[in-house]
């Protein structure tokens, strides 16, 4: 944690910070990618909506794209239990990319399914220390179509080839707005991080 300061009680403060960071060029350039990820807690304050998190500029991401597959020849109705199954979930390729004035491919990780692929990413992550919030984990989004890599389903209508199905960032930097405590914390897992 870099800094801790008290802020006024405003639920949308993290949005103002995001705008300010954009205006000051703190996303992209020398600090990392211009990609943004905001996990915004709005609505009534509770233990389930206590914090909003803004990821700082990413330096590494993991992408899964839709592979080339043949559509299922069996046409059925899943609502009537007519589901075309295969022996195993579809294997996957996770493209590891680093930011260097653009995303560049570093390696490809092959997984027999989603769980196997994600387990292979564990060596990219810092070791967890305690149970408090810490930077350096994975954050991003997975589309519904990733189910082909968790269940042995064969799609009747697969996504377009090369569509992005998953994008996870190595989230080394976070700005955390605690709405209940009215504080801002800045976390980084990067030694001597110039962005912080």
For the regions a language model picked out, list residue spans one by one.
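Signature of the chorismate-utilizing enzyme
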Residues: 1-196
